[in-house]
């Protein structure tokens, strides 16, 4: 039947069908609704605009937007209800694509001179909220004023939500202030507007105003849930407890959403015991309750407990949501539970969450932290729509696994895709620049941080300071450090480390004393940096003082890194016997690293007998590093013990240890040039060889002499001697 024949009359039978379809719309019962649709077609009532509008509404509410749009397009003389049915369907569906469709429908509606009503405007404002924009919404706001629709609580609440989600909280507050009446949704929208922007004080003020104005017996759980979501730091736990008491006083703990919000609040405020008590006392737990507690454990460093709780949830037959899976995946990332993470990946596929952005981001993060970058990349590539969190997870994964070049390539792709970076993104990219010691690129990234409005707060400030320091630009590093507000221990460590590694040990130690004077408590990394500074300066006594200071004054137990710094300190000072005694008295499991440091020092100082002792220790412990065998064989060669040299090489071959090829690189005009031993593939290898020969001749002319090191490097072609220049 041609669409132009749409009728308007209703008969008793079709009126009954209309009521049935409306009921199925409310229940989202797609199967039953389709059956009624079939009956409507058989009676010929589908030509009635009232039925067509209800059909559009039914399919839209059931998520079948393409079908709803098809029926809508068949209506020639559309009324405001027709437009509202489709606009509301798309706006409630959410998402960027649906929200843009709402904007297009609104333009078409205005072009056909259809005057919108309150429901139309509410749909527009909701869609603009999803886009976090207010461009079309402001035009619709002007229509609200023009049509005298201001005062409709449904429209005004949607308008407040649009402005708040677009970040224009002050504009939302203006609308809120002039509303003649407000319901609990209005109050919760305003509180959430401040809460999502981290403006806790303003959120609390609105909440207090609500408590004074709320009517007795009115539903207020949404408002309490909204204000609790704003309390996400330890300093707010006391305020959270007060709100908890008010919920008990008002008898609101029966609302599951509110109980979940309390569990989340206590978890974010690092009060895990209270979160557990709240979880245990929740009588009617749903998947959100379990997710909140799993995430709470994960965020508070109790990753193993998070995994155990998920097992309990699974055993209890509770179907997890994607957010539950995300919480457990994050826990597996933190404790390197790769096998469990893979099982969760399979479970995620079974539940159909593989295309969910949050779940995929957690998967990418888990695989990246476990070093499985190929799997992480597969997860990244399978999604068409990627947000900043997903890009950042993969970029930071490459940086953590020392694939800094790929991290920078991915960052360029991210910029090309128009994704605006966040703090963790920039911190990871700056770390990549630090590792590559590429100053010019680091300066460009610094420019990006300024362009995107990032300040020098943590972590950007400390990452910038580290980058400049590692690239040898200490003046710029110090300038960033001094301008960083609210410095944390990471900021101090970055600058101390930069000074130490650039030969300014005295300045590093002075900065450490300044750190103590300002009341900042040092951590493990701080002591690694200052003992390292003492090592490079030869301050043995001072190094001992700081090593003992860790446990005696700060209460930190020295770790392997601190013992390694002390062995290096003693070795550099020529106190090799003391270094050996220190290693043997160490009460921690240090593996091979301490003996490796001592072996290298013995070789440099010509202490052959002690070097043999350290080298044999390493061989007995099953060292897999070729340098151990190379250095030990060199010492035996110097002693003329050729049988031992042969024994060392046999042991090396038997253990499958091979000599790693030497590699170096330079940055020239924003391009990396990588060279390996025996390289003949570089396009400028001949020019490079000529330049090396020229520099070698100039070094000899300046008084440098070639010294043959007796360390043997065994290769398939034969035995090769390594050479180095000394003055």
Curated annotation (Swiss-Prot):
Source superkingdom: Eukaryota
InterPro entries per UniProt: E_motif (IPR046848), Pentatricopeptide_rpt (IPR002885), PPR_At4g14850-like_plant (IPR046960), TPR-like_helical_dom_sf (IPR011990)
GO biological process: lateral root morphogenesis; response to temperature stimulus; RNA modification
GO molecular function terms listed in the Swiss-Prot or TrEMBL record: RNA binding
Region (Type E motif): 594-669
Gene3D superfamilies: Tetratricopeptide repeat domain (1.25.40.10)
Pfam families associated with the record: E_motif, PPR, PPR_1, PPR_2
UniProt keyword Electron transport, yes or no: no
Region spans: Type E(+) motif: 670-700
PPR repeats: 13-47, 48-78, 79-116, 117-150, 152-182, 183-213, 220-254, 255-285, 286-320, 321-355, 356-386, 387-421, 422-456, 457-487, 488-522, 523-553, 559-593
Keywords: Repeat
Similarity annotation: Belongs to the PPR family. PCMP-E subfamily.
Name used for this protein in its record: Pentatricopeptide repeat-containing protein At2g33680
Originating species: Arabidopsis thaliana
């Amino acid at each position: 039947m041609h669409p132009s024949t749409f009728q308007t009359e209703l008969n008793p039978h079709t009126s009954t069908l209309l009521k049935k379809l409306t009921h199925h719309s409310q229940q989202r019962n797609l199967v039953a609704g389709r059956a009624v649709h079939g009956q409507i077609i058989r009676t010929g009532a589908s030509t009635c605009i009232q039925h067509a509008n209800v059909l559009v509404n039914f399919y839209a509410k059931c998520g079948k937007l393409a079908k709803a749009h098809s029926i809508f397009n068949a209506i020639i003389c559309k009324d405001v209800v027709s437009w509202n049915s489709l606009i509301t369907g798309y706006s409630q569906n959410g998402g960027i694509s649906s929200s843009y469709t709402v904007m297009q429908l609104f333009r078409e509606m205005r072009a056909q001179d259809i005057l919108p009503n309150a429901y139309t405007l509410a749909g527009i404002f909701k869609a603009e909220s999803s886009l976090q924009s207010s461009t079309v919404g402001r035009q619709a706001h002007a229509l609200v004023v023009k049509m005298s629709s201001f005062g409709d609580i449904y429209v005004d609440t949607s308008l407040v939500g649009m402005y708040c989600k677009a970040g224009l909280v002050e504009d939302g507050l203006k609308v809120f202030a002039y509303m003649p009446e407000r319901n609990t949704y209005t109050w919760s929208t305003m509180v959430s507007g401040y809460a999502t922007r981290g403006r806790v004080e303003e959120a609390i003020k609105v909440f207090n105003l609500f408590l004074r104005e709320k009517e007795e017996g009115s539903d207020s759980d949404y408002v309490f849930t909204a204000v609790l979501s704003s309390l996400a730091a330890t300093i707010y736990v006391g305020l959270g407890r007060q709100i908890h008491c008010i919920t008990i006083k008002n008898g609101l703990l029966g609302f599951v959403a509110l109980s979940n919000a309390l569990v989340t609040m206590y978890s974010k405020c690092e009060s895990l015991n209270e979160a557990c008590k709240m979880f245990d006392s929740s009588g009617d737990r749903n998947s959100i309750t379990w997710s909140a507690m799993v995430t709470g454990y994960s965020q508070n460093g109790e990753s193993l407990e998070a995994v155990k709780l998920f097992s309990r949830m699974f055993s209890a037959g509770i179907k997890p949501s994607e957010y539950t899976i995300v919480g457990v995946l994050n826990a597996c990332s933190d404790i390197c539970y790769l096998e469990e993470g893979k099982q969760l990946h399979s479970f995620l596929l079974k539940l159909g969450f593989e295309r969910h952005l949050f779940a995929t981001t957690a998967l990418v993060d888990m695989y990246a932290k476990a070093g499985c970058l190929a799997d992480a990349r597969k997860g990244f590539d399978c999604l068409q729509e990627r947000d900043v969190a997903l890009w950042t997870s993969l970029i930071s994964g490459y940086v953590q696994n020392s694939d800094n070049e790929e991290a920078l390539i991915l960052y360029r792709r991210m910029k090309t895709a128009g994704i605006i970076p966040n703090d963790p993104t920039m911190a990871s990219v700056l770390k990549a620049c630090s590792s590559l010691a590429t100053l010019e690129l680091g300066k460009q990234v610094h420019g990006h941080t300024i362009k995107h409005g990032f300040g020098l707060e943590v972590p950007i400030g400390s990452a910038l300071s580290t980058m400049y320091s590692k690239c040898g630009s200490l003046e710029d590093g110090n300038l960033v450090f001094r301008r960083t507000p609210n410095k944390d221990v990471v900021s101090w460590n970055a600058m101390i480390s930069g000074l130490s590694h650039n030969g300014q040990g005295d300045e590093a130690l002075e900065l450490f004393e300044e750190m103590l004077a300002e009341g900042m408590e040092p951590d493990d990394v701080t002591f690694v940096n200052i003992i390292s500074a003492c090592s490079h300066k030869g301050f043995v006594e001072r190094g001992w003082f700081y090593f003992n200071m860790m446990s005696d004054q700060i209460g930190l137990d020295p770790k392997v890194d601190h013992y390694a710094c002390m062995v290096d300190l003693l070795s550099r000072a020529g106190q090799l016997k003391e270094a050996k005694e220190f290693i043997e008295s160490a009460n921690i499991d240090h593996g091979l690293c301490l003996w490796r440091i001592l072996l290298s020092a013995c070789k440099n100082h010509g202490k052959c007998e002690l070097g043999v002792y350290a080298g044999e220790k390493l061989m007995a412990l099953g060292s897999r590093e070729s340098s151990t065998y190379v250095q030990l064989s060199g010492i035996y060669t110097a002693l003329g013990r050729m049988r031992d040299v042969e024994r060392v090489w046999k042991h090396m071959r038997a253990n499958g240890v091979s000599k790693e090829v030497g590699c170096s690189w330079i940055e020239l005009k924003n391009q990396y040039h990588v060279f390996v031993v025996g390289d003949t593939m570089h396009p400028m290898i001949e020019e490079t060889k000529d330049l090396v020969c020229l520099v070698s001749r100039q070094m000899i002319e300046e008084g440098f002499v070639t010294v043959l090191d007796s360390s043997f490097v065994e290769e398939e072609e034969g035995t090769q001697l390594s050479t180095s220049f000394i003055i």
